[in-house]
Amino acid sequence: MKPLHLKLNNFGPFLKEEIDFSKIDNNELFLISGKTGSGKTMIFDAMTYALFGKASTEQREENDLRSHFADGKQPMSVTFEFQLNHRIYKVHRQGPYIKEGNTTKTNAKFDVFEMVDGKYEIRESKVISGTQFIIELLGVNADQFRQLFILPQGEFKRFLISNSREKQGILRTLFDSEKFEAIREILKEEVKKEKAQIENRYQQIDLLWQEIESFDDDNIKGLLEVATQQIDKLIENIPLLQARSKEILASVNESKETAIKEFEIIEKKTLENNILKDNINQLNKNKIDFVQLKEQQPEIEGIEAKLKLLQDITNLLNYIENREKIETKIANSKKDISKTNNKILNLDCDKRNIDKEKKMLEENGDLIESKISFIDKTRVLFNDINKYQQSYLNIERLRTEGEQLGDELNDLIKGLETVEDSIGNNQSDYEKIIELNNTITNINNEINIIKENEKAKAELDKLLGSKQELENQINEETSILKNLEIKLDRYDKTKLDLNDKESFISEIKSAVNIGDQCPICGNEIQDLGHHIDFDSIAKRQNEIKEIEANIHAIKSNIAVHNSEIKFVNEKISNINIKTQSDFSLEVLNKRLLENENALNNQRDLNKFIEQMKEEKDNLTLQIHNKQLRLNKNESELKLCRDLITEFETLSKYNNITNFEVDYKKYVQDVNQHQELSKEIEDKLMQLSQRKLIEQNNLNHYENQLETYNNDLELNEQSIEMEMSRLNLTDDNDIDEIIAWRGEQEELEQKRDTYKKRYHEFEMEIARLESLTKDKELLDSDKLKDEYELKKGKMNTLIDEYSAVHYQCQNNINKTQSIVSHINYLNQELKDQQEIFQLAEIVSGKNNKNLTLENFVLIYYLDQIIAQANLRLATMSDNRYQLIRREAVSHGLSGLEIDVFDLHSNKSRHISSLSGGETFQSSLALALGLSEIVQQQSGGISLESIFIDEGFGTLDQETLETALDTLLNLKSTGRMVGIISHVSELKNRIPLVLEVKSDQYQSSTRFKRN
């Protein structure tokens, strides 16, 4: 990442500033120079804030970055253009703020652009997604950016002096090693889950084994007595258990099948006897019902005769009904003809009345034409009538307002002259404020040094007292330790190993006699008495253990005290008593008060002058605004006069209200005349159309009447022919037959029902006679008793078989589950053994007592130190090398850095280095860190680096060496920028970015020495 252009608005001391980094030729080394507080570090803050929304140092919050002199209505913003991998990007970030006059905060904004074909195209326009885009683009977050690109003031030696836990946090962020810690936790949880699953499987096997049914069988009970932890024995017994269960099931099944066959035989015999009994009863009943049905035969024959006559007269009845319909149509047609003739007469009367109205309307035509002409000529005036009416209303107001504006303008001019006289030749003196501020700062620094020295001396006395007390304790404990060691050496340790052999010797003595051969040494036994005092041996052994425990406790205490003394020595070496002023605190406080009073007086004077200038600017602005309003008033007055003249010329009216009333009246008269004329024409057209329709209807009705008369004549002829065919003489005969038609459906149903039942009886009697022929009926009660007996026996055996079958199948399922659990358990124990071992190694239970994450971080730290030593050797004239402290204690140590002094051939604590040596080591380590991170990340492009302060602690020769190191970075294609107050750097570095301040804002410019 290489900076190209930086634009700052209301950022720190920069109200509106631009820095063009393209003026730096060929990645030239350049110096950022300026007075204390001028805003040099703010340049780094601006670049970091533009990219990540944070300052270059963690101590600065976003609210601290906004300029105190910024306009309350203007936001703080930074625009940063940079080059990355031969592509150009621009970011614009606006900070959140509460706009003057508002109570709610204006939200932050962030836009990311990329240059494509010479133009910037937007890539992101939201704060969160845009910041994530930048992190992915650069390959680093804000913390990593501070470590790689910007080495902030007071922070870039932090990595050198930090302890293992602090380095772990830094390296974890840079190399994303948290994933290794996550792996350890995952493995830990996985092992925990696996062990729980294994225990659960043992419980499931035991539960299944206890639930297996024994059928009260001695063989199965014997097989089930095996303990479930003996999984191999379970595997052997399961086939035997299944085979015995099948034998029990087969025996029960054989008894069940025999009972089912016996029941089926008696069930079939009972069913056949019941069917035969029902058929005999049904046959007797059907024969009786059939005799009763035959008695209805004469009545059915009479019904059939009536139905035949009704069928023959159907055509005649249809002709009679048709005659009535035709006569009705003829009567309706005559009525329609009469109504239509009356409608035609009424329409002719209406037309004559409308013709009279039309003639009266045409007599007013000339007057209407004159009104139309007036409307056409003045329509444009009426459409914009408000404009002309407003001109009449505004003209007097505008005259009065113009006179008032002229008077106010004269008063403002006089006020401006008064303010200019008050200012006179007075000017703000900010240089004096700067001088007083510097003096006050120096006095405060001297006061703080005196107070810090007093505090440091008190702390030093306290630490020296603690150290002396610890040394006295060590001497006292060392003396006690020597006495205990002397006492321990005096003890006789022989035969102590026989203390636990007393029972063994007693057993041997009880098994042998005097004169026997000893089973231990092979010699003849002369005596069986007691030769060893076991009580004395045990007492001596307890005393030795007590002394050894005391020695161990004292050694532990001495080690703790030595560690505490080492810690106190480190704190003593870190106490720094600075050179202080010769003046007393009383004198310094008096001088401080005098300078603060002088500063306040000068600030009050500057504030008064600035207020007068602000009032002058305000009056100038008011005069300008008044002049604009006066010009606007004159323009509006002229426009009103022109509009009034135009209205009176065209309308011949000098009153807007009269014109509006007459115009609307004329428009109303014209509209009424036109609407009435159109209405008359529409009525005439409608009357003509209606008369034509009624004439057509009349012709249609007359044609219909003629057709109906012809149909009636033909229908009468058909009636006469049909009566002749049926031998009917008059209408009375026809009426009698017609009376039967109401009963026709009932008669037909009665006839059909009789025939259907007659046929059914014949069929059913024949069927039942065939079923009962040559068959004997048995005793039903005896059959029922035998049926119930066989059924009860069968159901009992079926229930027994179902229960045994279910239990056998359940046993099979349980044994299969047990086998499955055992197989899975064996395989699981085999598969998870490697995971158990891996989890212990990753958790630090290994020969180095290191967790996986710390092992990886130590590897990266070794790479960083090796890279840093290449530069440190040059800067320290081959005296110093950084080394990693090898002490390791279960995972969280091993990351401390010491320095190896080649002159003394010994390693030293990093705090023993001088300020200049510490700067050399910090710079070398920071450069090594950035290069290793770049190598590991791959996607990070380090084309620039910026360093803030630190060179003031170096002597001339070391300063030259450090500069040569930074110049070598330039040769690798990296832009290097340095912030420093060291004057020698201005002579060595030709290009300087100078930062100047006038106490309320700063500016920058590049210059060459």
From Swiss-Prot:
UniProt keywords, alphabetically: ATP-binding, Coiled coil, DNA damage, DNA recombination, DNA repair, DNA replication, Endonuclease, Exonuclease, Hydrolase, Nuclease, Nucleotide-binding, SOS response
Coiled-coil region list: 176-364, 392-502, 535-802
GO biological process, one term: double-strand break repair
Domain of life: Bacteria
Keyword DNA repair (UniProt): yes
Induction line: Induced by ciprofloxacin or mitomycin C in subinhibitory concentration.
Name of one Pfam family that matches: AAA_23
Residues reported to bind ATP: 34-41
Subunit structure: Heterodimer of SbcC and SbcD.
Annotated protein name in UniProt: Nuclease SbcCD subunit C
UniProt organism field: Staphylococcus aureus (strain Newman)
Gene: sbcC
